[in-house]
């Protein structure tokens, strides 16, 4: 096994600083990596690397279960989820667990069950991680050849890729099954202000599903982030699940083509870099999704989007001033444009004032008031329902603009609530994580390419210039 990586390629960049620290044959001299290089010490020890990965999965699932129970313990049913800093319960609520009409929480027991199940499974993963890290075989190739591998074995690597794809496909179909057969999911667009419903009429048309991928990512187009009905979301999961499963079977049954063998680098570090790149794309996409999309991330649980809070403010004051006798169709604002209503560049009637820049917002509390040419004046005068007024007043004061040390909400809104929106938390964290994963991709891709080319980027530590310089003092 040791012959796969020649010391000439890998070792010169590592600094020996403590030769006495030995870890069961995984010390610095034998691996070329110090203890702080983590799993790099286990590149050729498939059994121990398995232990590290299983233990890592256990930590992830433990966090999910513990945080889930923490949120359940702190949950106050009288306040909206987004005002309580929750990030896990909104996900469970979106899946339809414990939710009634209008996004009201009617039962927290499913949330408790979710937390306990995650804690129990994290214990199983934790024991598995400890076993494979400390007690199990160092390498799997001899005893369990199905689970063993050599990084350079292209056929085995694509088989492992195929297994992963099949598991992802099964995950996508779990959401489909929940939406179709097991109680349904929460639909923020359900009449009267949202409800849990089973999805019966899936969108399976490839022109619609793949049309999202071909949209521009800018402006009102919004790429896949612009999806705004659950039929498309669940239908998209049918497509993606099928593609992942069939792609997985394909990769298990076939060997890489010649062009792929030539174009790709086939080493553990290269696979790490590919994985980091994929996770980076996931992170950036999730960032945009949770910030802009109020269908996959319903505002009842995650709080309004930025544009939604802004439009809600304009709507709330239109309702108030209309009651006080203002003619909202013709009133002029300080700039000479309409104070309450104006026209968009393409002729639709939109809200006036600063919120004009968010004129292409779509939200379930606002859409019933639109006609064929934008906002319908007669509907604004006669058809506004109390639930629309209540919801917009609530969203107006909960804009996702707070920072840790500020009063949340729009700076000009005197009733804004001091909180940080889950949309802010989730989009910011996923942007930052996506960015660092991308940097990690560049780093490991550069190292993997250098090693494949027969040289290693870095300074030869034996001849490092600083060792020959006069001490500063």
UniProtKB/Swiss-Prot annotation:
One of its GO terms (molecular function) is electron transporter, transferring electrons within the cyclic electron transport pathway of photosynthesis activity. InterPro entries: PS_antenna-like (IPR000932), PS_II_antenna-like_sf (IPR036001), PSII_PsbC (IPR005869), PSII_PsbC_sf (IPR044900). The chain crosses the membrane at residues 69-93, 134-155, 178-200, 255-275, 291-312, 447-471. It holds the Pfam family PSII. Binds multiple chlorophylls and provides some of the ligands for the Ca-4Mn-5O cluster of the oxygen-evolving complex. It may also provide a ligand for a Cl- that is required for oxygen evolution. PSII binds additional chlorophylls, carotenoids and specific lipids. GO terms for biological process: photosynthetic electron transport in photosystem II. Belongs to the PsbB/PsbC family. PsbC subfamily. This is Photosystem II CP43 reaction center protein. It comes from Ranunculus macranthus. The lineage of its organism: Eukaryota, Viridiplantae, Streptophyta, Embryophyta, Tracheophyta. The gene is psbC.
